Amino acid sequence: MNDSCSWDQLWDQQGTLNEYTGKGIDLLERIMAYSKERASIELEYSSKLKALSKKTAMKMKSESELWNSVSYVKGFHDVIAGIVPVATQHELIAENLKSAVIPFTTQKIAEYRVAKKQLESDNSNLGKQLRMVIDEMAKSHKEYVKCYKETEAAMLKYAKAEKNMDISRLELEKTKNNYQQKCGMLEESKQTYAVMTTKANEEQSAHYDRKLPQLLDNYKKLHTNRILDTVEILSKCVEAESCVNQIIASCHNDMRRDIGLIDPSRDANLVVENMKSGHPVPQPFVFEDLGHPQDRSSFMGGGASGPAGSMDGMDATMKKGGTLMSKNGKGVARKQSMHQKFFGGGTADKKTDSGDYGTLPPQQRARKIAGKISDLEKEKDRATQSREGVSKMQAAYRENPKLGNPSDCDAQLAQYGHEIDALSNQIQKFKILLDDVNAQLGAGGLSATSVGGSDTPPSIRSVSSASSGVTSRVNTINDAHRTNGGVGGGRRESFSGSNGGSDTDPTINGNGHGRDELYEECSNPNPVLGEAIAQFAFDGAQDGTIRMEANEKLWLIEKDEGDGWTRVRKENNSADGFVPSSYLKVTWFGKV
């Protein structure tokens, strides 16, 4: 583009120039409106980001300790936390727009509107002044033309009168005087017209050569300054955002660093460490040889030797859940719950949980106790430091009584002493618990009495302990079978009485003859007390339990005695055992 272009060439385009200048100022107003809306959007965006981060963090707090400690979840936590400083920077963008861009733009818009109005007024005044001089020249020219025509008419009249011989001399003189008068007026109007023409030319020359170029130069200055201010305003808009880009980039780098700390191997170890129970795997199943049915034909007829009959009674008693033999040699027909079969003990051994993580599996309990010990030791250290601080303050009071009364510190020292003693007792208690748990974990599993003695409810003790306990009973029975020569060596006598279900205690003599046994026949299973439908599947992996499928129909042969287990039998009488009571939908027959 040619740089020599002059605004003087726009001498006849003032109207278009005014319209163009007004549009430039309107653009500044549009920039200001953009800045206001952008600031509002940035504030809303910042607020929504912070709300999102807070809402997500609140959801994370409700998760488990393991879930929040694995590195990939922690990485997500850190990224969410990193959103807050990013949101703060967007809030700063809005503040920069409000403080640096909008006020400056408002000021410039007002200045340029005033300047434009002044230029329009100056342009109007210059035009009016030029038109006024030109109008005066046109008026004098019109007067001059009028005088010229009147003089011409008077001259023709005088020439005609001079040739007319009939006109009087007086009339001729009168016509001549009129002609001469008109010639004077013509000369006077001519002089006036000449003066006004000169004045109009001078004014027009000044208008187009000096006044209008100066006005156009003012338009040019306004145009240039407005564009420069537009550039500055746009730069401020960009600077309002770019000044925080470095901080936002730093936040993003921190997020990348946190993401880089995600360690799958460490997470896998944490999962194992937090989920492992410490229970040993189930022990192998013990094969129980029942012999051949032909070997039982002798006791089916009513005769049997003492040892074999005793063994059969023992077997029947095991099926019923009673104890094998009392000290005086008498069998005790006493039912045993699933809870007692698995974990031993009765209701007298049940105690409430002391709050020492007794409901957790051994391995997790040991980890929790160790963490509790660490927390208590930290509390003890803080209490010890506080007591030392009070002791130093008391010593300072003793050296300088003006600072305070030393006896005022005695109450605090006593309080800290009690706290330290209580924390020490707690630490010692948990250390003993931890030693017990670690010792039993090192022994390969928990015994029937869980860590912490009977403080831990038997219902939550290790199932592996129950498995080993029941397995040992089965081994004892097998040993008895082998010692007495197998099941076929004797017979089982039925108990006397018309009901067949008497609960009187039977006595067993040495040779097995003349006994009133309570034990049931092997071929006579427990009576059916009701029916049940399995609501859920159960694997029956532990000893004494039975596998069942969802919606499977089962016979109820023993009620839940408060331990959460119910004894059932398959519908085809193929097997019986215990299942969780909560897994069943039961229907009892009559009064049970």
From Swiss-Prot:
Record domain F-BAR: where: 3-267
Domain REM-1: 359-436
SMART domains to which the protein is assigned, alphabetical: FCH (SM00055), SH3 (SM00326)
The SH3 domain, residue ranges: 527-589
Predominant subcellular localization, coarse grouping: other
Biased composition (Low complexity): 459-474
GO BP, one annotated term: positive regulation of clathrin-dependent endocytosis
Region (Disordered): 343-366, 447-519
Keywords noted in UniProt: Cell junction, Cell membrane, Coiled coil, Cytoplasm, Cytoplasmic vesicle, Endocytosis, Endosome, Membrane, SH3 domain
Coiled coil: 363-441
Bilayer topology: Peripheral membrane protein
Tissues expressing the protein: Expressed in the germline and specifically in the gonads.
Family annotation (Pfam families): FCH, SH3_1
Any one of the GO CC terms: cell-cell junction
Family that this chain belongs to: Belongs to the FNBP1 family.
Reported function: Plays a role in protein trafficking, actin organization and embryonic morphogenesis. Potentially acts as a cdc-42 effector. May play a role in hypodermal P-cell nuclear positioning. Together with toca-2, is required for protein trafficking regulating yolk protein clathrin-mediated endocytosis by oocytes during oogenesis and retrograde recycling and the sorting of recycling endosome cargo proteins such as mig-14. Also, together with toca-2, controls the distribution of actin at cell junctions.
Protein name: Transducer of Cdc42-dependent actin assembly protein 1 homolog
UniProt source species: Caenorhabditis elegans
